[in-house]
Regions:
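Radical SAM enzyme [4Fe-4S]-AdoMet core and its adjacent flexible, acidic
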Residues: 1-95, 102-103
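Sequence-level detector for tyrosine residue identity
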Residues: 26, 39, 77, 98, ...
Length: 194
């Protein structure tokens, strides 16, 4: 046993969210229960390739996430965790984090790897740190409207790409933190009573 930690991200939309309990059953059948962490992420229309009608609104996803955690707890999974401070925001806005696509083009954000117009360089040439696109990423600032938000330490303004596109990038925890705390409280009591 090598003590490897596996984290599985399940991208959900209005179609597949109804089946989230089945995937947990499948992991158990494979003998993976207790050997991995699982979390949900909403499908988004970041690059215009998917149907927006299938995507969740922020509050809908927050409810789906809470439902998923409840199902997981009922099935004996223990991936219930409180959100932690996110001091790094996103690798895309840090100076030394890059994404390289199969062609060798360099980007700051994974969502941009299919968009040649978003590349900031390539692996065959030195990176120009004065490149306008590069500077735009690393000069990201937390929006003023976020500075008074009680969950700022968790999201740090949210996804910079969503922030640019939609002017709002609030994570599910903004809408479900009270339910999440209630779940943690209930689960902790049950664990204590064992």
């Amino acid at each position: 046993d090598r003590n490897l930690q596996f984290i599985i991200r399940i991208n959900v939309d209005n179609d597949n969210a109804k089946s989230i309990g089945k995937i947990l059953d499948y992991f158990e059948e494979l003998g993976l229960k207790g050997k991995l962490d699982v979390y949900l992420a909403p499908v988004r229309t970041m690059n215009g390739q998917c149907n927006n009608e299938k995507c969740f609104a922020e509050k809908e996803f927050a409810d789906t996430e809470i439902n998923f955690i409840k199902i997981g707890l009922e099935k004996g999974y223990d991936f219930l965790e409180l959100p932690e401070c996110n001091l790094g925001i996103c690798g895309a806005v840090s100076q030394n984090c890059y994404v390289i696509n199969a062609k060798g083009n360099i980007f700051k954000c994974l969502n941009d790897i299919a968009k040649d117009e978003c590349k900031i360089g390539d692996v065959l040439h030195p990176l120009d740190c004065e490149n306008e696109k590069f500077v735009e990423w690393i000069s990201y600032e937390i929006p003023d409207e976020c500075k008074e938000c009680k969950i700022l330490p968790i999201c740090m303004g949210g996804c910079p790409v969503l922030r640019r596109k939609e002017k709002k990038a609030c994570p599910a925890v903004k809408y479900n933190y009270q339910k999440l705390l209630q779940l943690v409280n209930e689960w902790s009591k049950k664990e204590y009573e064992k």
